[in-house]
């Protein structure tokens, strides 16, 4: 049974911010792209359909036939049952369980402590503590002792871990290779995801019903949302709504605020059904909280109901005006910011989006909005879909970069990468052919960026990665900018340039070899002792897996034959070979390189291995492959 609240009477607040949007009849004009603003110093619970249950890899199958050992099992169970009634045994068991609970609480405290310290050792200690907590949670006797606070604390630790791991991953300055085994963020992410799924599974299976509350569920749902576990979220929620004991918890405002946008995005419910759920669950409330108002505003904007979205924004503003405690006011401000960003990134009416965008970059708001790059990415994509002129798109792009440059705190490295990738994806769609206009516009964009901040590797990598013109000369001019602007390069830029040669037929094998050698030289100068998988991938995409593989296949095989022993180790070799085994079209060709007999390849140039200081042979490729074949 959906239990909801009654919203209070019609709001009367009409801030200037909203009036300008509602009363705008003449459109919102765009300045030139260079005009960048300056910064100051009928639904019931019975209609819910439950999908399939969470599955566990270690769960027992139901309905197994009785085995011959069942009588023995029965005797053991009988013995244990009688033993449990013994006071001494019971006391010992209680003491053991108490020790387990104390250990669990100690680990919770440690996790909070480690998470508050931002250094490498604390991150590793947190991961170890999280692993201890996850293992401890496997104990049913421990779970039986939990009170609401214990479950809440664990969910809180998970949510904190998910958020911090994501932040660390996005802010990392290092370009990690996929074959660097010490990628701890990836390891931690897998650990966190497993822990989140396990907790969701336990709750779905009916545990913790007596102690489950909305704050705990909120943390769990937020964690699941970060991992984009949308089907699992919807299933968990629908399963809970239909439970007589816990149904009301799942209809709490805070829970609806998290789950309703997901059900709309995943097409589980229509916009009208979402409104009906909202109305049923809010008709008896004196006021609706800012979290749910924000979510409903977001859904309304996504559905094109901008008037209701503005109503939600006004209602949140009213809550802010009436709020007394500063802590609560700050939470409301966060909701205002969140909904404001939705008008920028989700609204399909670019005039409305621009109005809200300008309010942020001109700092013309009674509340602070942190301009998040996914919303700008979405805005640029919406502009393209609405066939906005390129100059309008450039206005948003350049104003965003200028805005980020004014921020005092460290800007995440991923922010510019996402923003630039969105721009150049659109640029090469709008200008699919090289001509005077398109080339001039590209040069203009590069000059714009250089005026805003120094040309960097990520910027040039993004242009080259999206480059789609059939001109080797122009591509080489772009590549020259690494030197022109004294860009500090990482192995990534060399791989991007090498891979892009696979898109242009005009590159000869000799020119591709030059880029391969340049990449290896950089690796050697940076004390790499092996050729990473990422470099092998760039080479194959430029040659044997390119559109021009017939002319480049033998060249690739020749290079592979010369450098095959430079693969990192046994593990990387297995990974390398298994990739090619799946490619039936070239598997036989690759197998030639592993032949114990010398092979001759029909290559038009000679492949010579330079003298390296650090790069070296790490494996015997032929023996490795032979051992793999022998072991099956």
Curated annotation (Swiss-Prot):
Instruction: Give GO terms for biological process.
Output: sporulation resulting in formation of a cellular spore
Compartment(s) of residence: Mitochondrion inner membrane
Membrane topology listed for this record: Peripheral membrane protein
Report keywords, A-Z: Membrane, Mitochondrion, Mitochondrion inner membrane, Phosphoprotein, Sporulation, Transit peptide
* Polar residues: compositionally biased ranges: 53-69
Keyword check for Transit peptide: yes
Q: Where is the transit peptide?
A: 1-23
Q: What's in the GO CC field? A: mitochondrial inner membrane
Q: Where is this region: Disordered?
A: 27-69
Give the domain of life.
Answer: Eukaryota
Q: Where is the composition biased (Low complexity)?
A: 34-52
Major localization class: mitochondrion
Q: What about PTM?
A: Phosphorylated. Phosphorylation promotes binding to RNA.
Tell me, in a sentence or two, what this protein's role is. Binds the 3'-UTR of mitochondrial mRNAs. Involved in the processing or stability of mitochondrial mRNAs.
What is stated as this protein's family in its record? Answer: Belongs to the RMD9 family.
Q: Can you state the subunit structure given in the record?
A: Monomer.
Q: What is this protein called?
A: RNA-binding protein RMD9, mitochondrial
Gene behind the chain: RMD9
